[in-house]
């Protein structure tokens, strides 16, 4: 894929961009507008930033076809560029249909197909930036007296959603079209670490007691606890290096807040938490169960399960979930304290809060 003006750094784009590209390609096919070609591939131009008409990017279209006279289907494939992202290469389908429109009807209807999540009220998990992107790219092309119905389908969405904490924030049965920009915000690259370090330095100039939140979900939990946003730092996958950086730059305390399925890695001494680096979560969970008095057979059952969430559900049925979560929080605190002492050569007061998929706090340690 290409930008209208190419930079030297490879670029990747967020899931909403590909959903909109698929819908736009399908609409163009219905209207008889030929797609462009670049390097022998079909591409569709997408206006990626609502504030800038010039910010157009070209997204490859894998397949496009008319299904009936008024319906079409197009497929693109998610490409986050050099950044680590679980949606890499996942197909993004858009089924579109032109319908007669009454004057009082909206011209554009967005629906969640298979694999695109729904919010608890049943509406599609399509958030503000994505909705605006659909509007600016589709509304100008809808014929007068017609409305366009768009159904986004993510065939791998339900499976991929099991590896996220979306359900903790009301996104059910699939992925969400999230984000506030077209380009992927790096979470595991060296560039993202440098950005986080700079933000950490700025916050430490004003506050010596900070909250490290793992991702936007952790940030939402922190804000619900009444924590001032100015004290919150989103740390993505670089928890260990940023803890050390905070200690070296004079932080007095750090409160770690995160989804248990992510922070659990710290209990096993894994301080760069990207799944592309290491993933021993079920093993860590099984070890915590044994430490709390669980049986070898119960630990074996944990190891047989596919996800942390399934394992926690299993433990909950046995009455073990709460004590095991508390044990994990204790281990995280102990390991993180030792990590900072080892690599920064000084102590740092730490606290840990774990929350579950429903966004409810399930364990805390180190809280005064």
UniProtKB/Swiss-Prot annotation:
Pathway note: Cofactor biosynthesis; adenosylcobalamin biosynthesis; cob(II)yrinate a,c-diamide from sirohydrochlorin (anaerobic route): step 6/10
Keyword terms of this UniProt record: Cobalamin biosynthesis, Methyltransferase, S-adenosyl-L-methionine, Transferase
UniProt-listed GO biological process terms: anaerobic cobalamin biosynthetic process; methylation
Catalytic activity as recorded in UniProt: Co-precorrin-5B + S-adenosyl-L-methionine = Co-precorrin-6A + S-adenosyl-L-homocysteine
Superkingdom of origin organism: Bacteria
InterPro entries: CbiD (IPR002748), CbiD_sf (IPR036074)
EC number: 2.1.1.195
Enzyme class, first EC level, given as a word: transferase
One MF annotation (Gene Ontology) recorded for this entry: cobalt-precorrin-5B C1-methyltransferase activity
Similarity annotation: Belongs to the CbiD family.
Matches recorded under HAMAP family: CbiD
Alphabetized PANTHER family for the sequence: COBALT-PRECORRIN-5B C(1)-METHYLTRANSFERASE
Name of the featured protein: Cobalt-precorrin-5B C(1)-methyltransferase
Species of the source: Synechococcus sp. (strain JA-2-3B'a(2-13)) (Cyanobacteria bacterium Yellowstone B-Prime)
Phylogenetic classification of the source organism: Bacteria, Bacillati, Cyanobacteriota, Cyanophyceae, Synechococcales
UniProt gene name: cbiD
